């Protein structure tokens, strides 16, 4: 947004699929946040400033094909995955596309109902072909799934709940986006397993959103 004649900018992931004619973002209201305190009050017709080119490291072309594609998110880190789970290309090279998403409280699971009904949706259900699986979790309230998604993978509870095989190097791949501690923990977890990070030159076993990690 333009504030006092100067652009006030923050990095946001695009949550809408690449074939849509609109752009969707997912944000939380930060108390007294310089941008979000203003962003929450915009109205139809108001202008927002966007870059002319999207950048990022969560790119399917940076990953190997495989059995299961895991999307691992905390908080608003789910935004790029909201775009990908509605993308045709996402389902072409994997048997399952599995989204693990944790937030602090239930109300922050803003896309929960949509994601739970994705396979049955009259439009996106034709894209997912039943391949999409969703594991929401909450860390600070009672919920059907509680705790960090890292722990759910470590103890195997997520695999049992979803009826899928445990993550295995050479068969499965992952995309990571969320808080810095979660990103770094999963990065170490996969590297300790012998997995390689993918990039634009070499397809790998996992990718993560570096704008969260390298600050």
Go through each PLM region and give its residues:
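A short, basic/flexible loop-to-alpha-helix module at the beginning of a structural domain
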Residues: 54-64
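Short coil/loop residues immediately preceding or within conserved phosphate-binding loops
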Residues: 9, 66-67
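Ser/Thr-glycine-rich phosphate-binding loops at phosphate-binding pockets of nucleotides
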Residues: 74-80
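Conserved S-adenosyl-L-methionine
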Residues: 66, 90-97
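Ferredoxin-reductase
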Residues: 1-46
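Reductase modules of NAD(P)H-dependent flavoproteins
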Residues: 100, 107-215
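Conserved beta-strand elements of the Class I
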Residues: 69-72
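Histidine-anchored nucleotide/phosphate-binding helix
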Residues: 80-92
């Amino acid at each position: 947004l333009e504030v006092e004649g100067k652009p006030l900018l923050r990095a946001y992931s695009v949550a809408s699929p690449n074939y849509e004619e609109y752009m969707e973002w997912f944000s939380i209201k930060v108390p007294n946040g310089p941008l979000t305190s203003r962003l929450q009050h915009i109205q139809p017709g108001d202008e927002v400033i966007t870059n002319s080119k999207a950048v990022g490291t969560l790119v399917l072309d940076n990953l190997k094909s495989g059995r299961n594609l895991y999307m691992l998110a905390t908080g608003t880190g789910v935004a790029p995955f909201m775009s990908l789970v509605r993308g045709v290309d996402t389902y072409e090279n994997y048997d399952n596309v599995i989204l693990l998403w944790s937030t602090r409280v239930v109300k922050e699971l803003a896309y929960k109902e949509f994601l739970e009904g994705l396979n049955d949706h009259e439009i996106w259900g034709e894209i997912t072909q039943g391949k999409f699986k969703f594991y929401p979790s909450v860390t600070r309230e009672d919920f059907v799934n509680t705790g960090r998604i890292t722990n759910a993978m470590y103890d195997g509870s997520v695999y049992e709940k979803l009826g899928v095989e445990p993550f295995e190097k050479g068969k499965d791949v992952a995309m990571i986006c969320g808080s810095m501690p979660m990103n770094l923990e999963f990065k170490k977890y996969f590297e300790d397993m012998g997995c390689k990070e993918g990039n634009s030159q070499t397809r790998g076993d996992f990718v993560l959103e570096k704008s969260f990690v390298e600050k």
